[in-house]
Amino acid sequence: MHRLLSLGLCNLLSPSILARVSAMSIIGRRGIHFLHKLNAENVPGALIEHGQSRLIDASLTLIRESAKLRGELVRALGGAVASTSLLGVPLGHNSSFLQGPAFAPPRIREAIWCGSTNSTTEEGKELRDPRVLTDVGDIPVQEIRDCGVEDDRLMNVISESVKLVMEQDPLRPLVLGGDHSISYPVVRAVSEKLGGPVDILHLDAHPDIYDAFEGNVYSHASSFARIMEGGYARRLLQVGIRSINIEGREQGKRFGVEQYEMRTFSRDRHFLENLKLGEGVKGVYISIDVDCLDPAFAPGVSHIEPGGLSFRDVLNILHNLQGDIVAADVVEFNPQRDTVDGMTAMVAAKLVRELAAKISK
């Protein structure tokens, strides 16, 4: 009946109204960014370009000055060889399913400082000490996209922001996603800034190594293909894999990726809990997709995949890792799928806390 009424209504509407309804349906799926693009043809191209450049310059200035202030503080306190600094990248549009990870950075920050826990990590480091953890804020991703900035340029903004943090020695970036597409511009920036490749420890339910998932070279399912193509990593170890198809395995072989699947984790455990990485390269990069964890521990993710790592499995791997960690990210927490008490936010926050302790020295 509803379908018949719908068909009847369509017959009564003019083609122009139907076109507008169709356009609004597309806008609903793609967001306000697409609405701006619909009107862009009525605005001079030079005006759009100038406006985009001004907003990007302002965004980079904010990150630059924030990082400079934190760097000066850490250097004034003295004694730090490496100090973790948070950088938020609230980006979700490259997700193949849900875009909720765009809302994750503020939820993670809130959970880091939640009154239900203290500010000391398991290894005894005090997060309130700026030499252990500072925060330079978020890249205004949505505002940049609302100006019509495409992904090529947006990825460059992310890379440049990471480099601005790294310029303030001894700050090292710990990036809060966002979907997993952010790892590509972050790793690229780290490798370019340090002048060579890194070793990557990647914890995830998925290999994220499609050539171009659904035609999107910047898809969150393709980030590690871009990283390996660019020569930004020497070794890529993927741990926690339990959702992988033929292309994922073939791409892994193509790039020489070391894939450790959950079905063999009991056999691989000793090796993975005693990793030594980064020798002969510029250091170690750690990328943690929250869905590497079993959904019993972290239900607030876009792609729920049972049979994952326990939280203690992940901490054992991190705590025992030997190597100089130069940067890291925590991605794919989706607050829109979290429990009412914010369980996954607390899980993501503890991952950040323990990573901060591991990076800082």
Features from the language model and the residues they span:
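N-terminal mitochondrial targeting presequence
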Residues: M1-H33
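Conserved alpha-helical scaffold segments that buttress catalytic/binding sites
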Residues: H33-K361
